[in-house]
């Protein structure tokens, strides 16, 4: 499935690596949803809950689920232009939810890089077609992607609560939680999100997850804080591409042993 949202820290390029490490489960929870790369790359679970504290995210996916044709029409009639990009930043919660969702897509797809903290990174355009060619193509293909995304969201619960509230509610052994919080600020170059997390916030999150009965996988960059608080957890690393930082090493911590398959051993022989 193609991405419907460009979002900082999205996992589209490494979603396959993460999905391969998801154990069998009954209920799926993703409390820091963002663009939902892992969710859209895996098979549906019996029960699924997606959540994000940034109200633009759940508003977008509710609009896609509830009336994809309406949102697709708004996007289809929104030109790829500097004026639309600048205007979209004036969007607010008093506006129609569907127009607000379209404005959110505009700021994320038509800008250089992607931020959700209100910072304007500049309208993406190019004289030689190096960037504008694929940027324009992606924008004008977006209505079709919206319609495809809607089908996957049909039976999904969508919430807009602090992550810890949701995590505590889903504290059951047959639940799998994929935790992809804003990474520790010391491991990246700049603030990117509307709702960032301090080191104290990360400590509180890890404290709750350590005591959870659910199966948990956490994504992050190499971190002494995470290593010290998650002693005894299974840890794996693989290469990923950061937005501006080139190649980075992605780390996942799991409170369960990974279930290897024949495919894993076949891939190992290739290297």
Question: Which residue ranges define each predicted feature?
Answer:
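Generic alpha-helical structural signal
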Residues: 62, 143, 203-206
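Low-complexity, flexible helical/coil segments
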Residues: 65-69, 83-90, 139-144, 212-218, ...
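SAM cofactor-binding core of SAM-dependent methyltransferases
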Residues: 20, 24-92
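SAM-dependent nucleic-acid methyltransferase catalytic core
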Residues: 1-14, 21, 67-178, 182-190
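Class I S-adenosyl-L-methionine
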Residues: 1-49, 53, 164-176, 183-271
């Amino acid at each position: 499935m193609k991405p419907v949202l460009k979002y900082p820290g999205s996992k589209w390029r490494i979603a396959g690596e993460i999905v391969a490490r998801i154990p069998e489960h009954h209920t799926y929870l993703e409390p820091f949803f963002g663009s939902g790369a892992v969710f859209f790359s895996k098979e549906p679970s019996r029960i699924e809950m997606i959540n994000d504290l940034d109200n633009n995210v759940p508003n977008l996916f509710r609009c896609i689920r509830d009336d994809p044709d309406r949102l697709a029409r708004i996007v289809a009639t929104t030109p790829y232009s500097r004026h639309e990009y600048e205007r979209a930043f004036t969007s607010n919660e008093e506006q129609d939810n569907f127009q607000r969702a379209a404005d959110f897509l505009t700021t994320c797809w038509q800008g250089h890089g992607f931020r959700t903290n209100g910072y304007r990174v500049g309208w993406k355009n190019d004289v030689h077609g190096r960037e504008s060619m694929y940027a324009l193509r992606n924008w004008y293909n977006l209505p079709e992607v919206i319609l495809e995304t809607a089908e996957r969201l049909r039976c999904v619960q969508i919430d807009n609560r602090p992550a810890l509230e949701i995590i505590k509610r889903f504290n059951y052994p047959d639940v799998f939680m994929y935790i992809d919080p804003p990474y520790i600020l010391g491991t990246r170059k700049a603030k990117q999100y509307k709702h960032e997390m301090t080191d104290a916030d990360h400590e509180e999150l890890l404290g709750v997850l350590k005591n959870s009965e659910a199966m948990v996988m956490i994504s992050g960059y190499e971190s002494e804080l995470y290593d010290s608080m998650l002693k005894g957890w299974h840890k794996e690393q693989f290469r990923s591409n950061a937005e501006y930082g080139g190649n980075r090493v992605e780390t996942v911590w799991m409170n369960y042993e990974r279930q290897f398959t024949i495919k894993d051993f076949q891939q190992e022989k290739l290297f």
